[in-house]
């Protein structure tokens, strides 16, 4: 089976796509996956680093661009559809999965017009504009939150959760090593989160009596690392401050409480790894979807949410202290998080995709082609 994964822009779209791709290629040596994205998106660097080929098209968003910007970006759409058609004709995928983001629209619509089975994977509680539009034509809509189902026809919805990377799955399967001091993990996504970084530093004076009793790992992003490190040391803390955490599996395994944003991929990781959390939703997220995401964990008893407008150093310190000082509460939160986890999401989504392929092509392995057969000529980036 050859799968095409279309979309990206942010890690929230890209990483679930990579997790699904990892599942597909491990099933059979003849399976392969190709991605389609844009040169400006995170996928342009992350997908090749994960070992998958990627094609690039030229397309930009329409939402929030103003009338002039939207009209200008509309002019790019015919070219994006032509590029999509060329890529699809060259790679001949058996199924196309849109993961959200600008690139998914032209590719999935063109695949539908070519009678290739299509699906979308919606990571958030509020479906993005592209996925809502594509939901009218695709065969399946994979959702992670019950709230997202209302955007799609009931017969198309598979609520299976968000796929997470295989390295995180290894952490899920690995027993946690015992450690003495409570451990706090702070991060704001792959680029850090400036407001979150600042509030954590403001919280430190209110946690001064704990500085000998807790260990802190803090991913800051490049912009704030030096300032944050100085802030910790000024308050007598000796944390592990990093611009970027390469091995999130180890970071999750070694912590008792997480302070972070409420992106869908992050929440999928927290629940599979069974970690209590304090969630600070990104206020500029489209349709305020991070607040909706966070509420699902809060309502289940797995997390505490502090909206950024209410976030002060004192408030954050109080929540950190109350959770770290209550092992029984942490354990209850961890169990609640685990009940929300979907460790089999990638496997179950791949199962449905293979069934779509079987219905269309008569075999779960798709169209007849030689094993490993690639396009007859090298792909032309953004041609």
Curated annotation (Swiss-Prot):
It catalyses: di-trans,octa-cis-undecaprenyl diphospho-N-acetyl-alpha-D-muramoyl-L-alanyl-D-glutamyl-meso-2,6-diaminopimeloyl-D-alanyl-D-alanine + UDP-N-acetyl-alpha-D-glucosamine = di-trans,octa-cis-undecaprenyl diphospho-[N-acetyl-alpha-D-glucosaminyl-(1->4)]-N-acetyl-alpha-D-muramoyl-L-alanyl-D-glutamyl-meso-2,6-diaminopimeloyl-D-alanyl-D-alanine + UDP + H(+). This is UDP-N-acetylglucosamine--N-acetylmuramyl-(pentapeptide) pyrophosphoryl-undecaprenol N-acetylglucosamine transferase. InterPro entries: GlcNAc_MurG (IPR006009), Glyco_trans_28_C (IPR007235), GlycoTrans_28_N (IPR004276). One of its GO terms (biological process) is lipid glycosylation. It comes from the Bacteria. Its EC number is 2.4.1.227. Residues 363-383 are annotated as: Disordered. It is found in: Cell inner membrane. Cell wall formation. Catalyzes the transfer of a GlcNAc subunit on undecaprenyl-pyrophosphoryl-MurNAc-pentapeptide (lipid intermediate I) to form undecaprenyl-pyrophosphoryl-MurNAc-(pentapeptide)GlcNAc (lipid intermediate II). The gene is murG. It comes from Anaeromyxobacter dehalogenans (strain 2CP-1 / ATCC BAA-258). Keywords: Cell cycle, Cell division, Cell inner membrane, Cell membrane, Cell shape, Cell wall biogenesis/degradation, Glycosyltransferase, Membrane, Peptidoglycan synthesis, Transferase. One of its GO terms (cellular component) is plasma membrane. UDP-N-acetyl-alpha-D-glucosamine binds at residues 10-12, 124, 165, 190, 245, 290. GO terms for molecular function: UDP-N-acetyl-D-glucosamine:N-acetylmuramoyl-L-alanyl-D-glutamyl-meso-2,6-diaminopimelyl-D-alanyl-D-alanine-diphosphoundecaprenol 4-beta-N-acetylglucosaminlytransferase activity; undecaprenyldiphospho-muramoylpentapeptide beta-N-acetylglucosaminyltransferase activity.
